[in-house]
Amino acid sequence: DELAFIATLNLLTWKPVIFAANVAEDDLSDDGASNEYVQAVRNFAAENGSEVFVICAQIEQEIAELDDDEKKMFLEDLGLTESGLDKLIAASYRLLGLISYLTAGETETRAWTIKVGTKAPQAAGKIHSDFERGFIKAEVVNYQDLLDCGTYTAAKEKGLVRMEGKEYVVKDGDVVLFRFNV
């Protein structure tokens, strides 16, 4: 009962925490495992239900000045799969229980952020309240499946586009076309 009451107070000390461990470039190769300070932060974070990710601010500064292709090559040369900024975003999403789904039209593709467990009508409501109110169904295809097929039409022809109803829980990386009538 006490914990439930405390949660309603929205105390800053009750909020989830992410620790960014800034290390030298040499400590990135093993994700800071050989760094005693990183291990101390990880132990503290584990005891307190927090997350830790390792970055090198110097490398992040260099990455920020590169275009996408150069950035990818630079990260590969360092043996990294993602930048510290990408790690921060992913950790934030996990800690806050968020996912993204996509909508795509002829002129615009957009990502929408929702809570994990959100059903299709409520996800549609993030775009416009009329979408939620008049929700009929959602045409859903996985992002990677759509990329592999090249076009929405090709994905549909291969049977990868599913019709989902009001109880469908939107998943991270879904590409959704909402059908509604108001």
Question: How would you label these PLM feature ranges?
Answer:
Residues D1-K171, V176, N181-V182:
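C-terminal-of-GTPase-core extension/linker across diverse P-loop GTPases
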